[in-house]
Regions:
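Acidic, metal-binding active-site segment of PIN/NYN-like and related structure-specific nucleases
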Residues: 5, 9-13, 130-171
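Active-site neighborhoods of divalent-metal-dependent phosphate/nucleic-acid chemistry enzymes
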Residues: 13, 19-20, 102-145
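Short beta-strand segments at enzyme active-site cores
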Residues: 61-65, 145-146
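Short acidic, glycine/proline-enriched helix-loop-strand junctions
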Residues: 95-98, 102-110, 114, 151-177
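Amphipathic alpha-helical interaction segments
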Residues: 49, 65, 69-72, 94, ...
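Acidic active-site catalytic centers that drive phospho-/nucleotidyl reactions
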Residues: 28-30, 69, 129, 148
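Short, well-structured N-terminal submotif of metal-dependent ribonuclease cores
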Residues: 1-62, 77-91, 167-173, 177
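Helix-adjacent hinge/juxtasegments
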Residues: 74-108
Length: 177
């Protein structure tokens, strides 16, 4: 059985313009994967609650890259699961279709790629992390929900937030422009 969310009343196709983005946040791949990963029930619950609320409130966005990575990660054999995968290929593709149907997905542009190169150099981000950050930076999303960045740090105009930390409040770090 699918762990999909209930479809929203109106689907949005293609890229979003991201107007009025002050309250919008970008979700990294790890949040999507934890929703289907039984190895950490606490993170699984947090990811589910976060995604359900974001879908209902329409405050979260996905990068096209996160959907691609989601399929790759959930179908990769894992040593600690005895070589099993989190999902079969068919299950992962079904969930990827649900993500495309239910969420506003942002696609890369030339500006995103140029910004990612700058982020890779300036912040010493790995290439794929730089691309996720660049989507948020270029499209004006103020927060990036991910455990792969330094929690509370500003990368340009984007603040990284680790939704899986057990710390009360948000600890802000100064912007490093």
């Amino acid at each position: 059985p699918s762990a999909s969310f209930h479809p929203r009343p109106t689907a949005v196709g293609g890229a979003t313009s991201c107007t009025n983005v002050a309250h919008l946040r970008l979700v990294d791949t790890n949040v999507l994967v934890y929703r289907f990963d039984p190895r950490d029930p606490v993170k699984q619950r947090r990811a589910t609650v976060l995604l359900e609320a974001g879908l209902q409130e329409r405050t979260l966005r996905l990068a096209h890259q996160s959907i691609v990575e989601f399929v790759a990660v959930t179908t990769r054999p894992l040593k600690d699961l005895g070589g099993r995968t989190l999902m079969t290929v068919d299950e992962a593709l079904f969930e990827a279709e649900n993500l495309l149907r239910q969420w506003d997905v942002i696609y890369p542009t030339r500006e995103v790629l140029s910004t990612a190169m700058r982020g890779m150099s300036h912040y010493r981000l790995p290439w794929f992390d730089a691309q996720i950050w660049a989507i948020a930076e270029v499209f004006g999303l103020r927060e990036l929900l991910s455990e792969d960045f330094q929690h509370g740090r500003h990368y340009g105009r984007v603040r990284a937030v680790d939704p899986f930390l057990d710390t009360p409040g948000v600890h802000e770090l100064p912007a490093l422009y």
